[in-house]
């Protein structure tokens, strides 16, 4: 349940202005500022990176974090900062942190924050704001930020005094990780972050009104200032608050053990939620192997079973679900990706496990009905299920029959009318990709093909936006991934359309020494849309792009750009290996691959 509040409304807010002078009066001589309090809490919570696009409202936070050894990574767009924080949250098991300036700096993050909400990523967004006395009075970049972010975040708070910073940040970090993880937002008015002497100077009234009104104004400002800093530097606990994660009951687990033990054709659909902390991904993999049940992996769970597991089924999911006598939805939601539940057979027993009650039962009143619905953590549930079924294994002929039909229906060796066959390009990348690679998916048609062909080598090695289908995640996700796993090879799979959102982050990759490889499928078209728009509506309007020299753009930002066309087909492997070598030597690389049209993804659009 969302928790939105302004600290001034809380019982433990601290002294009111009337009592600010007593006991907790501001220590005027202390040369500290509120940004230091923020930084201290972040360090105590193990935060290693803060992503930002700098602004005067938030400078104290950035400077203080850097002094405490927290790495400040500045991007070329605020959305990238949040996407990078999202990637850090997914890969590190901690909260990702982004700090942006007030007004337009914050509104630029809206799509990225909504994406984190729908992807269930614990992200802390901290935004600057106009001073406490100037909000609503026409100050620079002053808008009602709280109303904007309440629908997007689990928790929103506006700090009203310096002493509230530490408890607010601690609470936000705990809420971000509890229950169903998600983004949280804290607004910092500028006068809660800067030192007393500077704020005091701004509070000074030039030529105050004469008489009683002048005295009242002077008293009010003095009292407000004192209250703003009262108790600011009292010793407070900095360390993490408990995080609550819902779990299945013993009775629920036992009932599921009985159902699975009787099943002849069970299937597991594993979703991103199964990768959430605290259960290590390797433990979940061992549990799945122990169960021996064929699995379809989606979202962040791609790669959970490694590259070539006999249990990982990639194709013909609809047919498998029609034949299955038991389906376990482990963090998987019956939304558009499962045709709102219509692909589930009414004859199957269905076990659904999800931390979020709404997602757990989505569309269950229309197209499907769970036999057992568990509001709990999918990862730990799978561990307990496998422990309860020790000695029992799914009949081997069932996964073997599904695997036999698991052949990609493709024509990778066919020549396209122009340029390279995208399927061939992707096959060569999959063959040459390092075993420690992390794949970032940012695009439509080309990325859709990549999802079939590229095989993540292990858990937490595939990053895509999730249910929101957001374009533009590539630069930020790759930045966060490379910082978390500096020794890993990080690939961004871009469509030429989606590249436009974050190609400027090649500047960030260069400045922050985070070398990645961007593979751009350049067909000069928004092909995901064009595939359906043209046959249905008879027009390609707004779908056309150009065979732009994106490799030159990468060069201009300090990276290494290479164009690959049909004339380069015989040396495709060499060019891919050269890109890998460039990144090992510290240089971000962009492969601008000119691709032709195939019919591989006809009928693939989802609306």
Language-model segments: residues:
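Glycine-rich, anion-gripping cofactor-binding loops and their flanking helix/strand elements
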Residues: 90, 99, 269-359, 456-488, ...
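Glycine-rich phosphate/diphosphate-binding loops that line cofactor/substrate pockets in enzymes
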Residues: 11-14, 37-47, 87-93, 175-180, ...
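Glycine-rich, acidic loop regions that bind phosphate or pyrophosphate groups
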Residues: 5, 127-169, 187-193, 200-208, ...
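Active-site nucleophile and cofactor-binding loops and adjacent substrate-binding regions
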Residues: 53-55, 73-83, 98-105, 160-163, ...
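Phosphate/pyrophosphate-binding active-site segments
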Residues: 14-29, 199-204, 208-247, 254, ...
């Amino acid at each position: 349940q969302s928790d939105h509040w302004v600290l001034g409304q809380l019982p433990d807010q601290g002294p009111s202005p009337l009592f600010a002078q007593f006991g907790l009066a501001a220590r005027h001589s202390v040369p500290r500022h509120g940004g230091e309090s923020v930084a201290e809490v972040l360090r105590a919570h193990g935060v290693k990176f803060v992503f930002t696009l700098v602004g005067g409202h938030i400078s104290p936070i950035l400077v203080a974090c850097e002094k405490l050894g927290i790495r400040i990574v500045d991007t070329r767009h605020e959305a990238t900062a949040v996407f990078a924080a999202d990637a850090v949250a997914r890969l590190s098991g901690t909260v990702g942190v982004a700090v942006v300036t007030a007004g337009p700096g914050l509104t630029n993050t809206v799509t990225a924050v909504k994406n984190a909400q729908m992807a269930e990523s614990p992200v802390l967004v901290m935004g600057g704001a106009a001073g406490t006395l100037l909000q609503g009075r026409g100050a620079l970049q002053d808008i009602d930020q709280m109303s904007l972010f309440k629908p997007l975040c689990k928790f929103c708070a506006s700090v009203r005094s310096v002493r509230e910073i530490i408890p607010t940040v601690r609470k936000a970090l705990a809420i971000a990780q509890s229950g169903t993880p998600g983004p949280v937002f804290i607004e910092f008015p500028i006068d809660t972050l800067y030192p007393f002497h500077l704020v005091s100077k701004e509070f000074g009234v030039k030529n105050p009104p004469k008489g009683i009104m002048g005295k009242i104004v002077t008293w009010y400002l003095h009292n407000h200032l004192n209250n703003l800093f009262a108790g600011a530097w009292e010793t407070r606990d900095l360390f993490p608050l408990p995080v609550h994660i819902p779990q299945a009951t013993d009775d629920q687990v036992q009932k599921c053990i009985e159902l699975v033990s009787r099943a002849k054709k069970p299937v597991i659909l594993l979703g991103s939620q199964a990768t959430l902390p605290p259960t290590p991904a390797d433990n979940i993999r061992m549990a799945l192997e122990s169960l021996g049940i064929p699995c379809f992996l989606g979202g962040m769970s791609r790669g959970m079973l490694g590259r070539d597991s006999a249990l990982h089924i990639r194709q013909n999911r609809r047919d498998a679900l029609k034949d299955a006598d038991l389906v376990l939805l482990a963090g998987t939601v019956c939304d558009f990706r499962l045709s709102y539940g219509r692909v589930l057979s009414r004859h199957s027993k269905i076990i659904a496990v999800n931390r979020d009650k709404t997602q757990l039962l989505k569309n269950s009143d229309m197209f499907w009905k769970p036999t057992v619905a568990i509001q709990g953590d999918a990862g730990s549930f799978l561990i307990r299920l496998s422990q309860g079924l020790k000695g029992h294994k799914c009949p081997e002929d069932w996964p073997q029959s599904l695997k036999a039909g698991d052949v990609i229906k493709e024509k990778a060796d066919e020549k396209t009318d122009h340029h390279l066959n995208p399927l061939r390009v992707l096959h060569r990348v999959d063959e040459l990709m390092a075993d420690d690679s992390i794949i970032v998916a940012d695009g439509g048609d080309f990325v859709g093909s990549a999802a079939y062909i590229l095989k993540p080598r292990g858990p937490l090695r595939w990053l895509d936006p999730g249910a929101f289908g957001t374009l533009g995640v590539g630069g930020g996700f790759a930045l966060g991934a490379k910082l978390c796993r500096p020794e890993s090879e990080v690939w961004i799979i871009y469509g030429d359309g989606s590249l436009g959102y974050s190609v400027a982050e090649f500047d960030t990759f260069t400045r922050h020494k985070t070398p990645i490889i961007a593979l751009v499928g350049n067909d000069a078209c928004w092909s995901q849309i064009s595939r359906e728009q043209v046959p249905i509506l008879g027009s390609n309007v707004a779908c056309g792009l150009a065979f732009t020299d994106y490799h030159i753009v990468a060069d201009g930002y300090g990276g290494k750009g290479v164009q690959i066309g049909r004339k380069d087909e015989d040396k495709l492997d060499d060019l891919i290996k050269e890109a890998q070598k460039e990144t090992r030597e510290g240089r971000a690389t962009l492969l601008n691959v000119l691709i032709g049209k195939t019919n591989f993804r006809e009928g693939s659009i989802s609306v």
